[in-house]
Amino acid sequence: MCDFGHDHHHADFGFIVDTPEVRTLIAETARLTREVPDTALRVEALRPAFATLLSADGWLPDAYAEPDTKSGMGGGIGQYALYRAADGSLCLFSLVIPAGAETPVHDHLAWGLIGVYRGRQDETVYRRLDDGRDEAHARLEVARRHTVNRGEFYTLLPPLDDIHYVKTVSDAPSISIHLLANDTACVVRHRFDPASGVVAAFRSGYSNVKCEEPEGSPQTASGGS
């Protein structure tokens, strides 16, 4: 059962940014998760609430709208948790990519929505051509490229369109808002090298909160969003 409530045992969970706009989106996500079992229909139903958050001004703190030169993501990319369900079933975060910088090619492993709050991004989406049995290699081809402007967003329904990278094409850093059905920066996902076909496990981490380290777990590489 998803934990969208307010009783959390650690300050790194729950509403890290507690504003009416964020609470409204999380409440609507909780309602639709209860009432709409079909993932595609649920994501579609979330579009109005997500669009409202993207169009609202003043709710994102300046501290979570800046590049992070010390981030394990590299490239000055900041990834800031805004809300995290204690059971790992949902997160909301901002991704700040400096002008001209880009993320590695990566996946998300969760349904959700991603939209641009400030600036402009180019997204390149990949299609996987192999059957995925070899965890260390993948054959990818570009499925599409498009520009995402402020207020525009797209959906994730893995495995469809789950592998991509984004690049800031505005003169100032871009900020995208991500609502995803896992604890994205703390789960082990995949980073891809389309040229060589190499796939590597990675965990991007947040810039403002720490991921819990399971006992005896190996540390994974950083990068992605």
Report residues per predicted region.
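Glycine- and acidic-residue-biased ligand/ion/polar-headgroup-sensing regions
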Residues: 110-129
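A short glycine-rich, His/Asp/Glu-containing loop-to-beta-strand
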Residues: 73-99, 153
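Ligand-binding loop in jelly-roll beta-barrel domains
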Residues: 158-177
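Short acidic-glycine-tyrosine-enriched beta hairpin
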Residues: 128-163, 205
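Long hydrophobic alpha-helical segments typical of transmembrane helices together
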Residues: 192-225
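Conserved short histidine dyad/triad with adjacent acidic residue
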Residues: 93-107, 157-161
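A short hydrophobic beta-strand segment most commonly corresponding to one strand
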Residues: 113-115, 171-186
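N-terminal leader/capping segments at the start of a protein or of a new domain
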Residues: 1-58
